[in-house]
């Protein structure tokens, strides 16, 4: 009975279309207050009536690829209970070595591979030719 009530509350908060999409991609329909949205489009929610550890969650901007590496460090600390303050409540901290947050490129063309790796043969040949041309110019 409580599940039916919970689904009804979720549908009332989101609407039927969004509820069906969320239920399809996540397998769960939760409701709570929207706490924030990051620059990637991830939406962060909190519901203090849920049990501890399940009362904070994220809905990814891209429904089809739920990639946890798209969560920026500011919201990572909030969602994992390192900090109870939201990024909007914290003082901005930007060290000199900080780079923009990117998702983990493993399994894509942007992934790191060592120079003598089997699939880098063409890349290494091109780099060697460029180095030889630069050496000949000097």
Curated annotation (Swiss-Prot):
GO terms for cellular component: mitochondrial inner membrane; mitochondrion; respiratory chain complex I. The keyword Transferase does not apply. Residues 97-116 are annotated as: Disordered. Belongs to the complex I NDUFA12 subunit family. The keyword Transport applies. This is NADH dehydrogenase [ubiquinone] 1 alpha subcomplex subunit 12. Transmembrane segments: none annotated. Keywords: Electron transport, Membrane, Mitochondrion, Mitochondrion inner membrane, Respiratory chain, Transport. It holds the Pfam family NDUFA12. Coiled coil: none annotated. InterPro entries: NDUFA12. It is a peripheral membrane protein. Accessory subunit of the mitochondrial membrane respiratory chain NADH dehydrogenase (Complex I), that is believed not to be involved in catalysis. Complex I functions in the transfer of electrons from NADH to the respiratory chain. The immediate electron acceptor for the enzyme is believed to be ubiquinone. The lineage of its organism: Eukaryota, Amoebozoa, Evosea, Eumycetozoa, Dictyostelia. Complex I is composed of 45 different subunits. It comes from Dictyostelium discoideum (Social amoeba). It is found in: Mitochondrion inner membrane.
